[in-house]
Regions:
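Conserved alpha/beta-hydrolase "nucleophile elbow" surrounding the catalytic nucleophile
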Residues: 40-45
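Active-site loop/oxyanion-hole signature of alpha/beta-hydrolase fold enzymes
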Residues: 2-36, 171
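Catalytic active-site module of serine/aspartate enzymes centered on a nucleophile-bearing elbow/loop
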Residues: 149-150, 155-181
Length: 181
């Protein structure tokens, strides 16, 4: 069974903070009785990694795409500055309000999972686009810190691997999933 979660819907009626989002995400994951395989891109990867750290016995495997394990504070601040100048319509395509995205990013600045990465023992696939300069270094480092991980780079791909290289991503995912069944 496969479930796709809407992060924006998970925050409806709640404060737009990482803690609120992670709590809602955890509640969704906790509904599953069996071990789960989590796959997340960007913010979804951060949530999946956080959950695997907090619930190592529940996570069978992880796929982290464009992942960070220690938030790049300067990049987040710069990104938030840019967000303030962008029209609200740019955020609607993701289901978020502009103010919520800015608030969420602000609350993520202090996230740092370095001291907890040792809790992740499940197989981990880390994927990053060749041209994703904001996340490639961190993704490679994360792969080196996790004992049961492998790193795959998608050629000619930036941040949104799922839309920029869907076939390449699907092939990498399928090989990984075949190996954990």
């Amino acid at each position: 069974r496969s479930v796709s979660l809407s992060l924006a819907e998970m925050l409806e009626g709640k404060a737009a903070t990482y803690r609120e989002l992670y709590t809602a995400f955890s509640e969704e994951c906790d509904k599953e009785n069996d071990e789960i395989v989590l796959c997340g891109l960007s913010l979804g990867a951060v949530l999946a990694l956080n959950y695997a750290i907090d619930h190592p016995d529940k996570v069978k495997a992880l796929v982290l795409i464009a992942a960070q394990y220690k938030m790049p504070k300067k990049l987040l601040k710069f990104q938030n500055m840019l967000f303030r100048f962008m029209p609200n319509a740019m955020f609607k395509q993701f289901g978020f309000k502009k103010a919520d995205v800015i608030s969420l990013c602000d609350t993520m600045a202090e996230l740092d999972f370095r001291d907890s990465l040792c809790k992740v023992s499940c197989p981990v696939l880390i994927v990053c686009g060749e041209k994703d300069d904001a996340n490639k270094k961190a993704s490679k480092e994360l792969a080196s810190y996790l004992s049961n991980s492998c790193y795959r780079e998608l050629l000619k791909t930036c941040h949104e691997a799922n839309t920029e290289a869907p076939e390449g991503l699907a092939a990498v995912l399928q090989r990984f999933y075949d190996g954990i069944e």
